[in-house]
């Protein structure tokens, strides 16, 4: 009877910092942001200038987009502000 030996399997590698799950993330172009938020283009850029709206991400050249998660988080903040009784 022969003994069968197998080499030990390597320990799983755990990243030092958890990686964000970007598989569900997507870019929104300005027409989608306008439709989703109900804001005009000029209002979106004015709010960005004031630091009250998520800034756009450069896609190269003159192309920009927003992260869906950041826009929806901004919307949730506005809703939460309404529930607290003041304009967030």
Swiss-Prot record:
InterPro entries: AlpA, DNA-bd_dom_put_sf, Prophage_regulatory_activator. Pfam families: Phage_AlpA. Keywords: DNA-binding. Residues 30-49 bind DNA. GO terms for molecular function: DNA binding. It comes from the Viruses. SUPFAM superfamilies: Putative DNA-binding domain. To E.coli prophage CP4-57 regulatory protein alpA. This is Uncharacterized protein ORF88. It comes from Enterobacteria phage P4.
């Amino acid at each position: 009877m022969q003994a069968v030996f197998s080499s030990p399997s390597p320990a799983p590698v755990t990243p030092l910092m958890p990686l964000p799950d970007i598989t569900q993330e997507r870019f929104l172009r300005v027409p989608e942001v306008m439709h989703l938020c109900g804001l005009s283009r000029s209002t979106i850029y004015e709010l960005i200038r004031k630091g009250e709206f998520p800034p756009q991400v450069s896609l190269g050249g003159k192309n920009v987009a927003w992260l869906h998660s950041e826009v929806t988080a901004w919307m949730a903040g506005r809703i939460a502000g309404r529930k607290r009784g003041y304009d967030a």
